Structures are given as C-alpha cells and as structure tokens.
Amino acid sequence: MALPKANRLKSRKDFQAVFREGIRRNGSYLTLRALKPLYSRKPSLDTATQTTQPIESVHISSIRIGISISTKVSKRAVVRNRIKRQITSALYSLLPRLAPGWRLVFIVKPTAAESKCVSPQFLQELEQLLAQAEVFDGNS
C-alpha cells in the first residue's frame, strides 16, 4: 500500500534538511535519518518566561517520510522498486503509531538486495530503528 501524499517527503530541500540536521540510526538493511519537529522560541509578554510554539503547523501536523535507494543496491530498477514497495507497505502499517511532525528518510543498504530481504524483516528493522530514534508516539 502506498503512503498517503500528505505523508511523503518530496522536495530536494526537505531531503537535504533531514540529511544536514537530522539524527542517524543504523540497522543491517536500512539507515534512518530523522529530523524532529521544528519549534521556535517566541518571547511572551513576560520577558522572564519563554514559550515554545511551532513554526509551521503544516510540518507539525503530519509525519513526512522519504525512501532513498541507490543504484549501488541493485542495477535493476525492478529489484529497487520491489524493495521500495516492501518498505512502504511496512511503513504504512506503522504510520498510526508514529508521532506527528517528524521528517524521516530511510536509506536502503546493498545488503537488503543481497540477502533477499522480505517484508517481515523490513518491518522488524523499521520498528527497531524508529524505537531507537524515539519516533513512536509516546515513545512506546
């Protein structure tokens, strides 16, 4: 199942922001780059206290996910697309458990194609990486 359009990371600018400022978690088949929701320090009327408010409600409201798979993984587009579909399907099942506002990029490693990785393995590794990065809603 494909990710909803509201949950897709599309622009080059967004990908670059995640790579530049995000945290990194490594697994055997995937690498997760995650960028926490954007917050701004806005001064209140009382200068002694500062309040934190979201900069853009668009980025806070939904989680954005992108998948990067290089030709180093496989020269054949059929193989790369199959891996991408399996990861997307696993992410679709995890989507309701994820905290809003995060921007995530999953980078597929060449070991994913070499070991004939299947969907349950991707699901297990995705859960592990997301838990390490504390992306789950309520950090469950």
UniProtKB/Swiss-Prot annotation:
Instruction: Give the GO molecular function terms.
Output: 3'-tRNA processing endoribonuclease activity; ribonuclease P activity; tRNA binding
- Keyword tRNA processing, does the record have it? yes
What is this protein's name?
A: Ribonuclease P protein component
Keyword Transit peptide present in the record's keywords: the answer is no
Question: InterPro entries from the xrefs?
Answer: Ribosomal_Su5_D2-typ_SF, Ribsml_uS5_D2-typ_fold_subgr, RNase_P
Q: Native species of this protein?
A: Nostoc punctiforme (strain ATCC 29133 / PCC 73102)
Gene Ontology annotations for the cellular component aspect, listed alphabetically: ribonuclease P complex
The biological process GO terms on file are: tRNA 5'-leader removal
Q: Which Pfam families match?
A: Ribonuclease_P (PF00825)
HAMAP family in alphabetical order: RNase_P
| Protein EC | 3.1.26.5
Could you tell me what reaction this enzyme catalyses? Endonucleolytic cleavage of RNA, removing 5'-extranucleotides from tRNA precursor
From the UniProt record, report the name of the gene that encodes this protein.
rnpA
Q: What quaternary structure, including any partners, is listed in this protein's UniProt entry?
A: Consists of a catalytic RNA component (M1 or rnpB) and a protein subunit.
**At the top level of its lineage, which domain of life is listed?**
Bacteria
Role, per record: RNaseP catalyzes the removal of the 5'-leader sequence from pre-tRNA to produce the mature 5'-terminus. It can also cleave other RNA substrates such as 4.5S RNA. The protein component plays an auxiliary but essential role in vivo by binding to the 5'-leader sequence and broadening the substrate specificity of the ribozyme.
SUPFAM superfamilies annotated for this entry?
Ribosomal protein S5 domain 2-like
NCBIfam families from the xrefs?
Answer: rnpA
